[in-house]
Amino acid sequence: MKKNNTDIINFGCRLNIYEGEIINSLAKKNNLKNYTIINSCSVTEEAEKKVQYEIRKSKRKFPKKRIVVTGCAAQINPEKYINIKEVDFVIGNKEKLEKDTWSNLTKKNSVQVKNIFLDNKMHNNIVEKFEGKSRAFIEIQQGCDHRCTFCIIPFGRGNN
């Protein structure tokens, strides 16, 4: 989705779409320009491949824009994404919903990912509108308290 010269590209679940709207609002409030923000998914290997493809495609299409990778894939493996030469910033799932993250983006470290299990407070951001969408979503939960052996989601989203 194209927003005020900052593109936000969401992969994966509806929660990412919801949070993408929060990121868009925070980007607008902080007058963030010339960025591509990729809200990633890590639920499957194929999802991560799509994220990596989009990173490279976005940089080819808009070489002057700075690339920010956030979302579950960034939360789970920030080193992997900061080591992709096209990526400028990697931001964790909790950090992407904090206004300070976006107001000081160029002044901070390139990797802003904290331990997702140490912070279990809910954010209090409200989505004012879903731009370019015919459906809206509400947030039911942010994480999961179960630890199914096959599931990576708690490590990307934290506890509920």
Give the ranges of each region predicted by the language model.
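Proteins enriched for Cys/Gly/acidic motifs involved in redox and nucleic-acid/cofactor modification
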Residues: 1-160
